[in-house]
């Protein structure tokens, strides 16, 4: 088996698919990291009537080399209000903001429903683009012999109603 790269993510899916299956009821990607690119933070929302009509809007924030995801903890705030959402990094930088009218929803806006939080690390896939460092790949049959230098550390998660 060959394991390529890890992609940490914090995202949200609807508790109920009120408007139909993915992406009709929405998906909110609070933060996604592409493989070894520790300077790029992606935030995205997914929507559309069905997979063939999948649409998304998102933002990217580039960190400096000295402030990258390997060096320091970062705080991501997600301000979620009726018909709008905002992604803020380190209480200072707006990564992305969106309103229902920006994406053409006058009614049936899926992001006003209840969503649940997912914290995961994806292994493999095609999302990582060209951010794979081949020196980090483990080709050993027994993966326990490989150096384990990848981590997805979360200091805290806080949820509050404003």
What are these regions (language model features)?
Residues 1-162:
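GH16 jelly-roll
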